[in-house]
């Protein structure tokens, strides 16, 4: 039993590393931060999300309130922003970045979320279909690298749904 658990963890680690390596190579080739001067901040990420993450950074460091912000339009409750944009438990990682490193944080979160989507899909394939290592790695890497993930990496909060979907499917099964 112990060998089965260790084997499962190693398989999930490999499933995590493959798409992370692919994304890092792409970021290096394209010169995207942290490997270059370009960022993942385009469209909504540039116009809205970086400010939301700046607010979250302030909250995590005790400089702002979770409930209200005077910086929201003319001031207002923040529950909608938190629930829709920045409420992911993964965003706690922002605490370890400087406020000036929001672009780096967002790039890191794209990499992390894509890797985690591979892990959850690999785990699903392992438990649901008992696939061998190679087919499961190919399918989980394909799942992690699908166009939806790449396209919506600019709105990385949507990637949380891709991470959780295989777990939900496993629960339904």
Locate predicted features.
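Start-transfer (signal-anchor) and selected internal transmembrane alpha helices
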Residues: 1-32
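Membrane-interface junctions at the ends of membrane-embedded or membrane-associated helices
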Residues: 1-7, 127-131, 173
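Hydrophobic alpha-helical transmembrane segments
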Residues: 13-17, 108, 137-141
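Membrane-interface coil-to-helix junctions
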Residues: 23-121, 141-163
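Hydrophobic/aromatic pocket-lining and membrane-interface residues
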Residues: 89, 125, 172
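Transmembrane-helix signature of polytopic, membrane-embedded enzymes
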Residues: 122-144
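Specific aromatic-rich, kink-prone transmembrane helix
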Residues: 162-173
